[in-house]
Amino acid sequence: MKFVDSASVFVQAGDGGRGCVSFRREKFVPKGGPDGGDGGRGGHVWLETNSHLTTLLDFKYKNKYIAERGVHGQGARKTGKDGVEVVIQVPCGTIVRNAATGEVIADLTEDAQKILIARGGRGGRGNQHFATSTHQAPRHAEPGQKGEEFTLDLELKLMADVGLVGFPNAGKSTLISVVSAARPKIADYPFTTLVPNLGIVRYDDYKSFVMADIPGIIEGAAEGRGLGLQFLRHIERTKVLAILIAVDSPDIEAEYQTILGELEKFSATLLQKPRIVVITKMDVTDEPLALQLAGEQTPIFAISAVAGQGLKELKDALWRIIVAERAVPTNQVPQGGE
């Protein structure tokens, strides 16, 4: 399935039905009073999150949603039926903006979260409402109100606990494929991962968390080089960053500092997140890892996803951080990974 993380959508709520001009007509009541019914309300437009959706792809094929108008009122004081509402399904993590103003209307992060996005117009009143002692046969009624309409900009930020960050070929896709059921494309050339991948890591019977693998970052990503910048927003919601560096990197320290620099250029808040360093591909070397990053106390883990080396320790460490971060109130800024 193609991954799409932004879309524009036009939504229009239904207009209200027109009020009716009618007079009571019965066999023995030749001059009955007004009995025009009210028009029905136009259908609302709602947005609702669905945890089974992971992309905004559907909006590339359908980007206009128009609710039904209310039915017009009828005689005998019959109110028209309300218009059928429209419920638009979006993935969890969708940010909704008014395209005209840029205002954030909603940030939908919970499953089955439902918000009213465009309100249907009120039905017009029938002529029964306009009779007075001096004007007993009104021949006018109200039109229905117009339904609200907007163009919305939708932006998806994936909901994950762990964000995997690193240069191309650092082993991110291999790791997520081993510890979860995700099956990203894996090959020995740069930028094999072209879109983010999500995987659910389950272990020890009851522990589980969501891991996101994004395309590799290269130096200059913040200026648009490579693919990583396009998808960095998908790790903004994560609770912990795992920075992956291959053990055969020419300069692990320099690579680490480059990654931190690109993250900071994109958003300084990314460096406030807890982080760990994961040295990958330990199966290609017989040398024990002896590494201390200058000026850092960030935990370092050495793993081989292929051989299964160090994975239990890595998952345990990530789980401890996730549990601690889940306990942090949402209005409290998390501490950095120092």
Swiss-Prot record:
Enzyme class at the top of the EC tree: hydrolase
Tagged with keyword Repeat: no
Annotated binding of GTP, by residue: 166-173, 191-195, 213-216, 280-283, 304-306
BP GO annotations: ribosome biogenesis
CDD domains: Obg
Protein EC: 3.6.5.-
Domain called OBG-type G: residue spans: 160-323
Residue numbers binding Mg(2+): S173, T193
Subcellular location: Cytoplasm
Primary location recorded for the protein, binned into one broad class: cytoplasm
Entry GO MF terms: GTP binding; GTPase activity; magnesium ion binding
Pfam families associated with the record: GTP1_OBG (PF01018), MMR_HSR1 (PF01926)
HAMAP family for this protein: GTPase_Obg
Assigned protein family: Belongs to the TRAFAC class OBG-HflX-like GTPase superfamily. OBG GTPase family.
Assembly notes: Monomer.
Protein name: GTPase Obg
Source species of the chain: Chlorobium chlorochromatii (strain CaD3)
